[in-house]
Amino acid sequence: MGLVRSEACGLVRGSANVARRTLLSRILACTLTAAGVLAAPAAAQKRAPHRFNLPLARDLAADAAASARDRVPIFLFFDRYDCPYCERALARFVVPMAKEAPWRDRALFRQVEIDQPLPVVDFAGNATTHERLAARYGVSVTPTVAVVDGRGNVIGKPVVGLLTADFYAAYLEQAIDAGIGRLRGTTG
């Protein structure tokens, strides 16, 4: 048997059929790999959301303008799809708070999905994703709440984890109050 030269395969021992099979198997492997890479983000986007959710962070630059105008902080709830504590925090505390007077008027409530490549405009007006935004804040534990100003600076102590459920609402209220105080210059 002689050597067969193929541009895609290099030198292959055997007949032209072996070269064709090798070439086809490489094309198939590349195609399947590409299909898997392309399908992964689509599959991630198709996952069912939690039953209770805040408005997703989509345009934080616009939220920053509203924050400055109304002199209220931005409440970022960092969440993960498979986090049962996030579901509990959203259902029992965060979503009711966001809908309830006076809290709905004291902060802009936004949700950030740390395990999703969802598009978002950051505070500087740059396109990024929820995953990258969470990484910028160093968030790896969920749920995490960060109260931020219109530049995206954390202005209150972050609330990490569900902590003690009996006191969770109080921790959230303290974080919002501290953020309002910092924005309005009434606390240090």
Q: For each of these PLM feature ranges, what is it?
A:
Residues L56-V72:
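A short beta-strand-turn-helix
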Residues P102-A127:
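Thiol-based oxidoreductase modules, predominantly thioredoxin-like and allied folds used
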Residues E87-A101:
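Typically the conserved alpha-helix immediately C-terminal to a functionally engaged Cys/Sec
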Residues V141, V147-I180:
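Non-catalytic, surface beta->alpha helical segment in thiol-disulfide oxidoreductase systems
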Residues A39-K46:
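Boundary at the C-terminal end of the N-terminal hydrophobic targeting segment
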Residues M1-T22, I27-G36:
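N-terminal secretory signal peptides
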Residues E131-A146:
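Structural micro-motif
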Residues R71-D82:
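Short active-site neighborhood of thiol/selenol oxidoreductases, capturing the structured segment around
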